[in-house]
Amino acid sequence: DAIDDSNRVVIIASSTRDGEEEKVLTAFKRVLESHPNTVLLLVPRHPERFDAVATLVGRMGLRLGRRSKNDLLTEEMQVYLGDSMGEMMSYYRLASIAFVGGSLVNTGCQNVLEPAAFGIPVVTGPSQFNFATICRQLEAESALRTVANEKELADFLIDLIPDWARQAEMGRRGKALVEHNQDSLPALLSLLEPLLAEPSSDA
């Protein structure tokens, strides 16, 4: 795949909403100053916004590739737009760290269990009302970090990117919580049934 063969550090921003991408991109520009080998895999929640988000990326001075155009990830590319349907689980497989969208705007975050099930550290903004219980559990296990704004998001990513041991530990704790709660969280985990049934990518 376009990103699979890259040695870049991939941060996914999944299911982002209108008004949120600009905040994430602002944070990511700061991340690039410290970690220029990082790429942002940006996956907006609504397909009708793909083109508008692509325009925003260009307006913010970031170099863009698009899944819909089968662009290959080059060294110059800074943002890769996941403008396709039905590939979120494949995108999570490629990522080192996941920001879950809907959380830096007041719409409520999307499903934080998805990246946790892949053993990826999770970060969200403060709007978590629709997954409040599981967010609290993940945070108590040090598998999820809540940030208040784009500045805190940038600070967290800048610190976490070079800390491979912490990434692995956050990911391990999140995946363990998902597995431990399979019986006690049936409603939430029903969302993950297709994912949990998939073979491991390194099998």
What is the predicted function of each stretch?
Residues 1-203:
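Nucleotide-activated sugar donor-binding and catalytic core shared by glycosyltransferases
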